[in-house]
C-alpha cells in the first residue's frame, strides 16, 4: 500500500472525503468547476442516504415506525435501497476508485492481500482484548446480541438473500457511511487519525443493542475491524473499494459456515 508524502493530518478533505491535491502558494485560486464540486443529484442522494441510514441503524429509531415482526425483512430491504442511493451519492469517488484499481490490477491484488492479513491481525488483537476484559469482569461466555440476532435472521431467509444482502450489499453500505462519509465529515474539524478512530468506535457501537457492560466489551473486535478498514481507506488514498472488499470477505466468511451447517 502506498501513501502520500504529505502527512495525513495536513491533507485537506473534499466533500466526499478524498484529499485535495497540493496547491502552491503562488497558484491562483479558481472557482470550483462542475467536474470538481458535488452536483445537485449527488447532494440530494447524500442527504437521503445519511439521514435514512443514521435513523434506522446507528440510532435504532426504526422501531417507532416498523413492527417487530416486519423488522428483519424491512432491514434487508433498507440495505438494498440504501445501496442504490449510496451508489448515486458517491458515484464520482467510486468511479475514481474503480479507475485506480483497473489501472493497477496487480497492485490492487497485493493491497487486498496485505490489507486482509493486517485486518486479521488487528481483529485478533481486538478479540483477545475483548476476551481478557470479559474474563476480568466475570462475563466470560457472554454473546453479543447483534451476533445472536444475525444468526436468527440467517435462518429466516433463503441463503442467496443472506449472501447478497448481508454478505455484499450490507458491508458496502456500512463502508459508504462510516468510511466514505463519516471520515470525510470528521476530517473537516479534526485530524485524520481522530476521524479514523471516531468512525471505528461508532462502527463498533453500531453492533451494540444496549449499554450493558457485556455488550460494550463484546463489541471491541468490531471496533478494531472498523479501525483496520479506516486505516486501509486512508492509506489507499480514500479508495473505498479496498475496505469494502475486505468487509465483504469478512462477512461472507462468517455467514457461509452458518448457511452450510
What is the predicted function of each stretch?
Residues 156-261:
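Transmembrane helix-loop-helix hairpins at the membrane interface
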Residues 68-70, 97-170, 188:
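Juxtamembrane helix-loop-helix connectors linking adjacent transmembrane helices
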Residues 41-53, 141-145, 167, 178, ...:
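Membrane-associated alpha-helix detector
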Residues 40-57, 114-119, 196-198:
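Alpha-helical transmembrane segments
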Residues 91-96, 131, 135-140, 208-212, ...:
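Transmembrane helix-loop junctions in multipass membrane proteins, especially transporters and channels
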Residues 1-38:
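Low-complexity, intrinsically disordered extramembrane tails and loops of integral membrane proteins
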Residues 54-59, 82-86, 118-127, 199, ...:
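Alpha-helical transmembrane segments of multipass membrane proteins
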Residues 44-96, 143-148:
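Alpha-helical transmembrane segments in multi-pass membrane proteins
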Amino acid at each position: 500500500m502506498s501513501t502520500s508524502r504529505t502527512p495525513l493530518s495536513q491533507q485537506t478533505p473534499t466533500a466526499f472525503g478524498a484529499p485535495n491535491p497540493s496547491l502552491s502558494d503562488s497558484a491562483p485560486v479558481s472557482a470550483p468547476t462542475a467536474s470538481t464540486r458535488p452536483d445537485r443529484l449527488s447532494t440530494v442522494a447524500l442527504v437521503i442516504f445519511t439521514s435514512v441510514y443514521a435513523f434506522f441503524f446507528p440510532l435504532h429509531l426504526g422501531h417507532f415506525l416498523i413492527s417487530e415482526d416486519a423488522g428483519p425483512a424491512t432491514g434487508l430491504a433498507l440495505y438494498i435501497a440504501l445501496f442504490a442511493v449510496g451508489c448515486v451519492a458517491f458515484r464520482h469517488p467510486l468511479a475514481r476508485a474503480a479507475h485506480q484499481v483497473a489501472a493497477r490490477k496487480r497492485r490492487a491484488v497485493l493491497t487486498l492481500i496485505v490489507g486482509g492479513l493486517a485486518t486479521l491481525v488487528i481483529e485478533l488483537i481486538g478479540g483477545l482484548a475483548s476476551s481478557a476484559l470479559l474474563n476480568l469482569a466475570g462475563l466470560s461466555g457472554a454473546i453479543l446480541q447483534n451476533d445472536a440476532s444475525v444468526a436468527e435472521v440467517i435462518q429466516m431467509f433463503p441463503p442467496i438473500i443472506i449472501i447478497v444482502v448481508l454478505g455484499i450489499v450490507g458491508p458496502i453500505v456500512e463502508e459508504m457511511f462510516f468510511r466514505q462519509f463519516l471520515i470525510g465529515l470528521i476530517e473537516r474539524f479534526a485530524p485524520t487519525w481522530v476521524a479514523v478512530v471516531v468512525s471505528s468506535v461508532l462502527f463498533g457501537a453500531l453492533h451494540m443493542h444496549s449499554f450493558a457492560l457485556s455488550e460494550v466489551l463484546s463489541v471491541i473486535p468490531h471496533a478494531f475491524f472498523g479501525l483496520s478498514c479506516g486505516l486501509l481507506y486512508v492509506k489507499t488514498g480514500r479508495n473505498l473499494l479496498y475496505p469494502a472488499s475486505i468487509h465483504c470477505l469478512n462477512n461472507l466468511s462468517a455467514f457461509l459456515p452458518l448457511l452450510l451447517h
